[in-house]
């Protein structure tokens, strides 16, 4: 337990033995259905060389034979999960394909029984993935596209599992073999904003003034490799000039860390090294804490000789992929319970933990309710190197046009632990007792289904 005042695990959770005997209950799914709504963005959101203007919010409901009903949520990201699908279709068309995979998964679940959500995901992932290849006419469809489509289904399965087994805390819900991986209870988690291509430098400076101290910056801008590199060098120079001198008490060196996300846009290691040479020239190199997904996944470029912390995200589709990336020199993993399902995230996190590879939680521009699923993981991971706390990227407040209305859908919209203050989430006993509100139904999303 870390991060300032450590909260007692015993005060937050029931003993594991108190729920033993219920956790293997066979749950039969009587009904499954879904719906979605579109949430517009404030401005076009750019990464991977593309731009999206809205995010589909999907809700999946599972009902058991006992009459229990639970709704899981998903914020779809076609561009993130498979840029080739995004490029081959209209924005709505790509979203419709992913949603069709969610609907297909629900048809597979009707009449099916399960003991735990992890096994359930293992059973349906391959057929849903194969269905996705068929409807997208893309035999090279990225597996992350299928996982993204299954987030709402998986969340609903976890909530139904908890309901049927009388579990009301995140700690008790996590199976025993994963508890060591998520054994911390931080009282602070760093809140990381995202600076996409179109975010003005003025807004980046304002974010720092508001207390944010760990900055995620999208690199790999549109254009040829040469054009991309020049744009990224200029962007880095502008950002470093604006905030590079700012000090913080939250890091070991007192400087603001930069977290670059290239989303696989750098086709060669030499090109990335040119960007890092530029960073060195402007004295920004020592502030680069993480570079996420610099290279295309299919290039299989090793990264152990780059000399910085390189994180895998979308290339670590599964726990097996995470092992491969670690063997290639990747020394951090960006976890996304809100993009690859909680079930798969637990597997990936355990692999990383066993190999002493630090993890943090990255966003997918998800809804305020879904932020809590990511926060639940970030709050329990080992502290990130150089910090005495967990890391959680969240950027929905920067991008959703109707963000205030979306906050009202949260079961505890006014809870202090829901909000970022001075670049931090402060997580007290109330937060851990309520598990961020994930077990309490959201009236809005219930009504979307019913």
For each predicted feature, which ranges?
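Conserved, mostly hydrophobic/aromatic
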Residues: 60, 67, 153, 166, ...
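Catalytic domains of carbohydrate-active enzymes, especially glycoside hydrolases
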Residues: 206-220
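N-terminal export signals
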Residues: 1-15
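Metal- or metallocofactor-binding catalytic centers and their adjacent structured scaffolds
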Residues: 70-165
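Short, Gly/Pro- and small/polar-rich lid/capping loops
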Residues: 14-61, 65
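Active-site mouth loops of central-metabolism enzymes
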Residues: 185-202, 219-221, 267, 311
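Flexible C-terminal active-site loop/helix
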Residues: 365-450
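Catalytic core of soluble alpha/beta enzymes
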Residues: 219-372
């Amino acid at each position: 337990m870390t991060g300032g005042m450590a909260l007692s695990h015993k005060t937050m959770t029931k003993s594991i033995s108190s729920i033993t005997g219920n956790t293997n209950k066979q749950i039969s799914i009587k009904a499954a259905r879904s719906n979605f709504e579109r949430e517009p963005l404030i401005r076009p959101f750019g990464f991977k060389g593309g731009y999206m203007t809205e995010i589909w919010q999907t809700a999946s409901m599972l009902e058991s034979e006992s009459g229990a009903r639970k709704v899981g949520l998903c914020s779809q990201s076609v561009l993130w999960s498979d840029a080739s699908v995004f490029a081959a279709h209209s924005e709505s068309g790509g979203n419709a394909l992913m949603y069709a995979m969610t609907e297909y998964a629900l048809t597979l679940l009707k009449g099916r029984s399960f003991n735990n959500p992890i096994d359930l995901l293992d059973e349906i992932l391959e057929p849903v993935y194969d269905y996705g290849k068929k409807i997208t006419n893309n035999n090279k469809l990225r597996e992350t596209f299928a996982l993204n489509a299954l987030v709402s289904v998986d969340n609903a399965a976890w909530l139904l599992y908890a309901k049927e087994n009388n579990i009301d805390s995140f700690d008790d819900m996590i199976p025993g073999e994963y508890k060591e991986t998520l054994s911390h209870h931080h009282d602070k988690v760093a809140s990381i904003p995202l600076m996409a291509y179109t975010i003005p430098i003025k807004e980046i400076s304002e974010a720092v003034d508001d207390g944010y101290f760990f900055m995620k910056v999208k690199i790999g801008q549109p254009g040829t490799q040469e054009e991309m590199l020049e744009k990224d060098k200029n962007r880095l120079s502008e950002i470093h000039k604006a905030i590079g001198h700012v000090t913080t008490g939250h890091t070991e060196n007192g400087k603001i860390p930069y977290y670059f996300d290239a989303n696989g846009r750098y086709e060669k290691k030499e090109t990335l090294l040119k960007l890092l040479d530029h960073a060195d020239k402007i004295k920004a190199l020592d502030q680069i804490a993480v570079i996420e997904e610099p290279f295309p996944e299919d290039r299989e470029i090793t990264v152990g000789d780059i000399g910085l912390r390189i994180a895998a995200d979308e290339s670590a589709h599964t726990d097996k992929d995470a092992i491969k990336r670690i063997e290639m020199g990747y020394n951090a993993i960006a976890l996304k319970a809100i993009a690859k399902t909680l079930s798969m995230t637990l597997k990936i996190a355990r692999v990383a933990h066993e190999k002493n590879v630090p993890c943090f939680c990255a966003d997918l521009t998800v809804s305020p309710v879904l932020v809590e699923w990511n926060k639940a993981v970030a709050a329990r991971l080992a502290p990130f190197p150089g910090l005495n706390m967990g890391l959680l990227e969240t950027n929905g407040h920067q991008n959703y046009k109707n963000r205030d209305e979306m906050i009202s859908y949260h079961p505890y919209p006014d809870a202090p632990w829901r909000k970022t203050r001075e670049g931090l989430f402060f997580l007290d006993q109330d937060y851990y007792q309520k598990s961020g509100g994930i077990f309490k139904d959201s009236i809005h999303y219930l009504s979307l289904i019913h």
